[in-house]
């Protein structure tokens, strides 16, 4: 059958299709990546979720959060200006240094206002990271500010299937501390000043949200429940996929093959997680059904799902909280079992600092995995998915031992649709609000906004 399909498409003339074309089947709808074949197919069984659409790729905004601060001495580049050599912690991103913006001197003073005298600023750091707002001291009623991702989602969310996508890899449960709700330590995305956006940790549930794995269609067909869940989503849309491949160019067929292969591979890894025993390397972090036993596999799956969401324009705004603030998760595959939070209170112990550096570099290697994938995905006008994205990465705490929010470890990856300079390290006065960077990101993504959080001006030096 595959051979016949190849023969039938060999002489087919490419026809125009919508950027919003979706493949449909029983209980499934599969969004597609950007294809060069144009606008809309008329009179075809292939369904369109939204008609029309610009050929200019949209800007995607993705915000990553890591807890407990970093080892600052190996985070910042030695020299300002062009990035010639990256510091030790950032070296996994060396292949993408021309896409990096490194910053020195950004602060979230709003996180300091209500900090405990002993320096317990975990919840305040996480809360202010994307909001530039002060966490309201209360164990029952939370209040902060709307986050940058949600402001962007409000601006562009009506054009996508999901206004935003919030992901994490650790249970969002956390106890109250020093008069502050534990919610502050487990949320970086805020839809309103009083409504934090919960993140999803289960890759299968994220996959189903993206690709419409809806078992309600069982009752409209003769498909049994066991057959439905055993079938790949690609099996359910294969007829639509075959028709589409007959109507597009050779280049688009190659892109479709690569994309569908990626979807099948991610789906297979999720199914493996569903069928594996419920045990955990970390007794303190019990694993629900559908969560990979291997933590790295969990991280990488979430990266792949974010890439698929951006590639198909299913969403343009996403956050990724790798682990919750003040986590004491350990990383035995790095050669030690000390908890992350315990290590962050290093008291300048060289052994603890070495281990913190290894955790920092490991987290950056996960970011590098996603960045490399985004660099490989072609979009319009010779650009890539990474060209049309801005990925903010950092922590709301600078030094975990001091629990401060001064000179935060922050970097920005991507070119924002060609609007941003990159490949540079900028040093700013130590009183520069990080909100200036968040404001600049929103403006360069096309949001008509003049201030954000405690901003004083858009951060200079980013405009291309």
List each model region and its residues:
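Ligand-binding pockets and gating/stacking loops
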Residues: 2-464
